[in-house]
Design a protein with these regions (language model features):
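Bacterial N-terminal signal peptides that target proteins for export
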Residues: 1-9
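Bacterial N-terminal signal peptides
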Residues: 8-16
Length: 144
């Protein structure tokens, strides 16, 4: 009787071992588009896409306004854990806050988008690079 009881447990353990040996891989997000305008429209409105298609650590450039007599440029490499998402406000927020964006540069493999507010010192530039898909590689905040 003991033997018949132990056999199913042993078989169950044997069958479970391959699942334990290889950890499950995270599902890779599908590239929204190879065309930058379509990619950016999806990327700018989706935190999961922003997380999936950003290079880490993200190069972040900003102005230190506490320095006298002029602000100085600071460059940091920020891991995902130090970033606040969304990196680009979604369309509804941009509209509510009067923010606009323009594509300043676009080639087959690089693009630069500026997010700004007219008649204010708000200006943030986003730099993208395309490999198998577009990825955000740098953010520069020149806001005054």
């Amino acid at each position: 009787m003991k033997r018949s009881f132990l056999l199913p447990i042993a078989i169950g353990l044997t069958l479970s071992l391959p699942a334990l040996a290889a950890p499950a891989k995270k599902a890779q997000a599908a590239c929204p588009s190879q065309k930058f305008s379509t990619f950016f429209a999806a990327f700018s409105d989706s935190v999961p896409l922003q997380k999936a298609f950003t290079d880490y650590p993200l190069t972040t450039v900003m102005l230190d306004h506490a320095v006298e007599p002029e602000p100085r440029k600071i460059s940091k490499q920020l891991p995902m854990s130090k970033l606040s998402f969304p990196l680009i406000p979604p369309k509804a927020v941009r509209t509510k806050q009067g923010l606009a964006f323009r594509v300043d540069q676009e080639t087959d493999n690089n693009a630069k988008v500026s997010l700004f507010k007219v008649d204010t010192g708000y200006q943030v530039a986003y730099f993208f690079r395309k490999e198998s898909c577009w990825k955000l590689e740098r953010r520069e905040d020149w806001s005054m």
